[in-house]
Amino acid sequence: MFSKVRLLLNKELQRQRENICLIASENYVSQDILAVTGSVLTNKYAEGYPSKRFYQGCEVVDESENLAIESCKTLFGAQWANVQPHSGSSANYAVYLALLKPGDTILGLDLNCGGHLTHGSPVNFSGKQYQAVTYSLDFETETLDYDAILQIALEHKPKLIICGFSNYSRTVDFKKFSAIAKQVNAYLLADIAHIAGFIAAGLHQNPLPFVDVVTSTTHKTLRGPRGGIIMSNNQAIIKKLDSGVFPGCQGGPLQHVIAAKYVCFKEALNPKFKQYMQQVKDNALAMANWFLKQGYRVVSKGTETHLFSLVVGNGKDVALWLQKANIVLNMNTIPFETKSAFSPSGIRLGTPAMTTRGFKTNDFIFVASLIDKVIKSNGNQKVISQTKTAVLNLLKRFPLYKGLAY
C-alpha cells in the first residue's frame, strides 16, 4: 500500500520541481519544516492548552506549543497568540464564535473584489450563520475607498468588520479601518493570511495596535506548514478567543504542525527573511510593471505586495494553457466581475514560491514574457510546447529539495 503512496509522493515532487509556481497562496517550506511535520508528534492527542490538557502524557507537546506561542508573539509583537487553528478559515470561524451570535451583522470585502469566502460569502458559514454585508473597491482605482466603507458601516452597524483580503495587491491602512470600527462600536478583525510575511518583516503596517484580533495562515508568505494562528492585544477578549478555538470549533490540535509552526516563526525571525520578503515584493512589482508596459490591464494598475491580477478575458482557458506549459497559477475573478467564478476574466499571479527557489526580477520578467506569448498565441500547441521547454531549461538553475526522494 505504501508503495502506491510513495509513487505519488515522488510524482508530486517531480511536478513541483518541473513547474513554475505562481499561485500566490503557495510556497515551499524548508526541509526542517518537512521533517517536523512528518514527525512522531503526529501521534499525540492533546485536547486543551499547555498545562490544561484533557489527556496525560502532554509534557513534551506542552513545551513545543509554548515555544510556538512565544515565537509567534515575538515575531508579530503580540501580547497573546493561539497557534492551534488548523487553517485560516478555522481561525476566522473561531473568532466569529468568540465574538458574535448567530444573525449578527458582519462587514467584509466582496469576494469578486478580493475578499475571502470566510468574510461573508453566501456559500460559506460566514454568510449563512451571520448577516453579511459587503463593501467594494473604488470603481476607477480598484483600491479601497475608506470613506465609502465608513458610510456602509454607519448604515448597517456591523458587530464585526473584517479587513485583510485574499486578492488585493495594495497595502491596507489598518489605522483607518480602526477609526471606522470605533465609530460604529464594532470589533475589528484583520485577516493577514496573505501579507503576514510582510508584516513580520516590517514591510507593511502591523495591524495589532489598531485591531481587536488578527488571524493568519502560516503557509503563504510566512513559508511555513499549512495552518492558522490567532493573535490579539485586547486582553478583554483573549479568553473568549481561546474558547472559540477549543472547544468552540476544534478538538485535538495538530501537534506536529504546531511544532512546524515554531520552526517557521524562528525562520522568519532571521534577518534573511526580511531580504526574502523584499525580493518577493520587488519581483511582483517588476512582473506587474512589465505587463503594464505591454498594454495589459493589471487590477489597481500595479502591486505593493506579492500578488496581482491580470485581466485576460478568459482566465480559465489561460490558466489551462499555462498549466500545459508548466506554469501554474489560478484563474480569478476581477473587481466588478461580470462572468462566472468558474470562468472568470482574470488570472492571479504571485511571487513567493519562485522567490524561495531563487528567482530574481529578471527571471520573473522572462516568465512574464513566456506567459505573454502563450496568451497571444491563443493557446497554440506549438507555442505551449516551446514554452514548456523554456520553463524546464530555466528551472535547471533553480533546484528544489536537493537529494530528497521518497
UniProtKB/Swiss-Prot annotation:
Keyword set includes Amino-acid biosynthesis: yes
CDD domains in the cross-refs: SHMT (cd00378)
Gene Ontology MF terms: glycine hydroxymethyltransferase activity; pyridoxal phosphate binding
The keyword Cytoplasm appears for this protein: yes
Catalytic activity: (6R)-5,10-methylene-5,6,7,8-tetrahydrofolate + glycine + H2O = (6S)-5,6,7,8-tetrahydrofolate + L-serine
Pathway, per record: One-carbon metabolism; tetrahydrofolate interconversion; Amino-acid biosynthesis; glycine biosynthesis; glycine from L-serine: step 1/1
Gene Ontology terms describing biological process: glycine biosynthetic process from serine; tetrahydrofolate interconversion; tetrahydrofolate metabolic process
PROSITE patterns xrefs: SHMT (PS00096)
Positions bearing the site annotation: Plays an important role in substrate specificity: H219
GO cellular component assignments: cytoplasm; cytosol
Residues that coordinate or bind (6S)-5,6,7,8-tetrahydrofolate: L111, G115, H116, L117, S340, A341, F342
Localization in the cell: Cytoplasm
Database matches in InterPro entries: PyrdxlP-dep_Trfase, PyrdxlP-dep_Trfase_major, PyrdxlP-dep_Trfase_small, Ser_HO-MeTrfase, Ser_HO-MeTrfase-like, Ser_HO-MeTrfase_PLP_BS, SHMT-like_dom
PTM sites of type N6-(pyridoxal phosphate)lysine: K220
Cofactor requirement: pyridoxal 5'-phosphate
E.C. numbers: 2.1.2.1
Keyword set, alphabetical order: Amino-acid biosynthesis, Cytoplasm, One-carbon metabolism, Pyridoxal phosphate, Transferase
Taxonomy, superkingdom: Bacteria
Gene3D superfamilies xrefs: Aspartate Aminotransferase, domain 1 (3.90.1150.10), Type I PLP-dependent aspartate aminotransferase-like (Major domain) (3.40.640.10)
SUPFAM superfamilies: PLP-dependent transferases
Protein function: Catalyzes the reversible interconversion of serine and glycine with tetrahydrofolate (THF) serving as the one-carbon carrier. This reaction serves as the major source of one-carbon groups required for the biosynthesis of purines, thymidylate, methionine, and other important biomolecules. Also exhibits THF-independent aldolase activity toward beta-hydroxyamino acids, producing glycine and aldehydes, via a retro-aldol mechanism.
Record-stated family: Belongs to the SHMT family.
Subunit: Homodimer.
Record's protein name: Serine hydroxymethyltransferase
Organism: Mycoplasma genitalium (strain ATCC 33530 / DSM 19775 / NCTC 10195 / G37) (Mycoplasmoides genitalium)
This protein's encoding gene: glyA
